[in-house]
């Protein structure tokens, strides 16, 4: 088993979970800042947004998770703040981040669709990296299986939990997001085939489809009325994205890169 603590500095400990999130964040900021000028924004617009949105998104992701696990946290109030042990819901972070984005764009007089198109591949890459935090924490895994011989030994060893090998759903989602990121980056190099909103719509459909399937493999899902909450959210986002695509492609003069 890999130690979930990356290193200690006196009384302070830095967990691998946090390292994965921070690495994903830094790469996301770099990619978004690099793309911003092509969408009539500046790198400062991106950085200022991240400084506001990132801490709020973490809080939102935690509140979302705690709300659906309140039966436990109501009896363990001190654990609410122990996010280094895991327990932040991606959809909670995405919802919070999107709300902050629209408010930020309103006050900065920026186009929120442009911003979402810039953010989509960056978020997808950050999610691909961040999922490895679940690996180090031994969480977000699936059912017990007899063997995982198709995986490297370090993953097999870390996925041996409570006396059984577990389906590495974190890995499936990480790879799915990485493939989606590559598709977006290749597609974005052919802007004539794009209109504003296509990239964020693709993100919602791609991530939603992957999460819909992979969530069904997990054993620790947040539940609502007997159905996994993330599957509700996935279906909702897929529908929103499809409707948005049809609406945008019926309009004129909304090319991806404005001259």
From Swiss-Prot:
Disulphide bonds in the chain: none
EC number: 2.5.1.145
EC class (word): transferase
Transmembrane segment boundaries: 12-32, 46-66, 83-103, 109-129, 167-187, 194-214, 226-246
Keyword check for Transmembrane: yes
PROSITE patterns associated with the record: LGT
Pathway assigned to this chain's UniProt record: Protein modification; lipoprotein biosynthesis (diacylglyceryl transfer)
Membrane-protein topology: Multi-pass membrane protein
Signal peptide (from-to): none
GO molecular function: phosphatidylglycerol-prolipoprotein diacylglyceryl transferase activity
Function according to Swiss-Prot or TrEMBL: Catalyzes the transfer of the diacylglyceryl group from phosphatidylglycerol to the sulfhydryl group of the N-terminal cysteine of a prolipoprotein, the first step in the formation of mature lipoproteins.
Protein name: Phosphatidylglycerol--prolipoprotein diacylglyceryl transferase
């Amino acid at each position: 088993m890999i130690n979930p603590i990356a290193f200690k500095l006196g009384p302070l400990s830095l967990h691998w979970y946090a390292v994965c999130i921070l690495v994903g964040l830094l790469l996301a900021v770099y990619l978004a800042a690099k793309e911003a000028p092509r969408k009539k924004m500046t790198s400062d617009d991106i950085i200022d947004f991240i400084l506001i949105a990132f801490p709020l998104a973490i809080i939102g992701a935690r509140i979302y998770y705690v709300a659906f696990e309140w039966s436990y946290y109501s009896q363990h109030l001190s654990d609410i703040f122990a996010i280094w042990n895991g327990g932040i819901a991606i959809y909670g972070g995405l919802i919070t981040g999107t709300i902050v984005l629209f408010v930020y764009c309103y006050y900065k007089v920026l186009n929120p669709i442009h911003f979402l198109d810039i953010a989509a591949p960056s978020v997808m890459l950050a999610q691909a990296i961040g999922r490895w935090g679940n690996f180090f924490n031994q969480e977000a895994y699936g059912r017990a299986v007899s063997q995982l011989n198709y995986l490297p030994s370090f993953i097999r060893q870390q996925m041996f939990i409570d006396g059984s090998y577990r389906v590495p759903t974190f890995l499936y989602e990480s790879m799915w997001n990485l493939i989606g990121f590559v598709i977006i980056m290749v597609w974005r190099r052919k802007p004539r085939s794009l209109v504003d909103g296509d990239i964020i719509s693709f993100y919602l459909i791609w991530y939603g489809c992957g999460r819909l399937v992979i969530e069904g493999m997990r054993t620790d899902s947040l539940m609502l009325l007997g159905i996994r909450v993330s599957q509700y959210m996935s279906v909702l986002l897929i529908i929103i994205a499809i409707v948005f695509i049809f609406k945008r492609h019926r309009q004129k003069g909304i090319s991806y890169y404005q001259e």
